[in-house]
Amino acid sequence: MQLALAAKYIGASIATLGLGGAAIGIALVFVALINGTSRNPSLRSTLFPQAILGFALSEACGLFCLMISFLLLYAV
């Protein structure tokens, strides 16, 4: 019983590593937005919606990792 509980905690902690990847992805999206806007300020209106889409996709991947972690902790 203790081994199964330890495996559950280890699996949940490994699943949360994806949150770090999502954070890095979000940072890279906004770094690219700042670089693009600083190089050509007139493109801000076209770059910003694409950056928000990239943010949403990166955040969704992070939330999926968090959801899997919670499922491993509380549903299995």
UniProtKB/Swiss-Prot annotation:
Query: Which residues are annotated as site, described as Reversibly protonated during proton transport?
Result: E59
Family matches, as InterPro entries: ATP_synth_F0_csu (IPR000454), ATP_synth_F0_csu_DDCD_BS (IPR020537), ATP_synth_F0_csu_sf (IPR038662), ATPase_proteolipid_c-like_dom (IPR002379), F/V-ATP_Csub_sf (IPR035921)
**Which GO biological-process labels does this protein carry?**
proton motive force-driven ATP synthesis
Keywords of the record: CF(0), Hydrogen ion transport, Ion transport, Lipid-binding, Membrane, Mitochondrion, Transmembrane, Transmembrane helix, Transport
A molecular function (GO) held by this record is:
proton-transporting ATP synthase activity, rotational mechanism
Q: Which Pfam families match?
A: ATP-synt_C
Q: How does it sit in the membrane?
A: Multi-pass membrane protein
Q: What residues form the membrane-spanning segments? A: 14-34, 52-72
Entry annotated with the keyword Ion transport: yes
Record-linked PROSITE patterns = ATPASE_C
Q: Provide the assembly information.
A: F-type ATPases have 2 components, CF(1) - the catalytic core - and CF(0) - the membrane proton channel. CF(1) has five subunits: alpha(3), beta(3), gamma(1), delta(1), epsilon(1). CF(0) has three main subunits: a, b and c.
Q: Which family does it belong to?
A: Belongs to the ATPase C chain family.
* Purpose: Mitochondrial membrane ATP synthase (F(1)F(0) ATP synthase or Complex V) produces ATP from ADP in the presence of a proton gradient across the membrane which is generated by electron transport complexes of the respiratory chain. F-type ATPases consist of two structural domains, F(1) - containing the extramembraneous catalytic core and F(0) - containing the membrane proton channel, linked together by a central stalk and a peripheral stalk. During catalysis, ATP synthesis in the catalytic domain of F(1) is coupled via a rotary mechanism of the central stalk subunits to proton translocation.
Q: What is this protein called?
A: ATP synthase subunit 9, mitochondrial
Write down the species: Candida albicans (strain SC5314 / ATCC MYA-2876) (Yeast)
